[in-house]
Amino acid sequence: MSADNVHATKGERMYDTGSTTFMLICTMLVFLMTPGLAFFYGGLSRRKNVINTMLMCFGVIGLVGVLWIVAGWSLAYGGDGSSPFIGGFDQLLCLPVLNQVLQAAEGNAAGGAVYPEIINIAFQMAFAMITAAIVTGSLAGRVKFGAMTAFLGIWLLVVYAPLAHMVWGGEGSFIGDIIGALDFAGGDVVHISSGLTGLILCLMLGRRRGFGMVSYRPHNVPFVALGAGLLWFGWFGFNGGSEFKADAVAALAILNTVTASAAGMVSWLAVERVHTGRPTLVGASTGLVAGLVVVTPGAGFVEPWAALVMGLIVSPVCYFAISHLKTKFGYDDALDAFGCHGIGGILGGVLTGLFCVPELSWTGKGGLFYTGDVSLLVSQILGIVVTVAIVLVLDLVIAAVVKALFHGSLRVDEADEALGLDASQHGESAYPSFSGLD
């Protein structure tokens, strides 16, 4: 290629190569999170269900990857912006992508964009993948693989995509603009939606065989730590990339991500030490994730000291939800998707209403701590309530449809559950030479 072909001609505007590279790296980091979650959940599961648990996460990669290209992206971010609830159908199969690529090849930055819009398709696909994968943690050990796949496929298009539009659809979007709720990287869209969906489905499925009588200990603690480490690393792209350019706010989001996750880990270990008398690696890993969850809604809106406070607060709250609420109410959130992501996401959204720096706010409204004005806090709470209501109603409808399609039950039969889903559903074993306890 000659030098003349490398550079844009006079009058043409190139994309910002720094931000383009940054967003490409962030996108790849977020894609790493779903395999990381597979290890995290796989380690927490019982030995006889580890392959099923991990496959539910890996299966989401294929399922969401296809559906996002076909319709998910268009429903979330397509259209002309006239609808506050959903995108449109103008970008089905991502057909406009070719024009963007050709424009970029000619050295033209489409519409004055900082980087090619095509990156957003992949970046948001990775968000959709990790969100759907989080749901599977509540269902471990008893759900039909086909039923789970069918549910999540419909859920992606009917719940996740419209919710993403309502929060991140820009001017006119219902939650992000009309209500004025802030969600930097996915407190409402990712964590509350997935955690609440997990809770709803685990209530519909019922408790695992032996729940309350059998101790469901993590079968592979190093897997849990490995998964947490991959999630932690990927989360820098998750939060940092949500600024959508390489600037000081992206750097702030990354710093806050480290700060909150570290504080969450320390706080969890302290609570665990007081409650049980000993710190654990599973506890450290869970606290790390809880800290990541709580800072997600406000990663680019709060100061580092506030991220520290958020991390310190979230672990006792999530620990209580996991250790006490499940026992009190008797629901079987198997791998604590609701206890960590649902509760942590709600708390993060509320705390953003307290600690948001006015100058960093998308709406111009600052947190109560800075302004003494409760308007942003009210918007945050209202945004959470609306998210919960939408997810609750649509989840129940989708679950009823899928249940009817699968002969009235989303759950495997008792014999298959007792044998283990690895053998009964997949004919595989993670440890074929091991003959000990499950």
Q: What spans do the regions from the language model cover?
A:
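Glycine- and aromatic-enriched membrane alpha-helices
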Residues: T9-D438
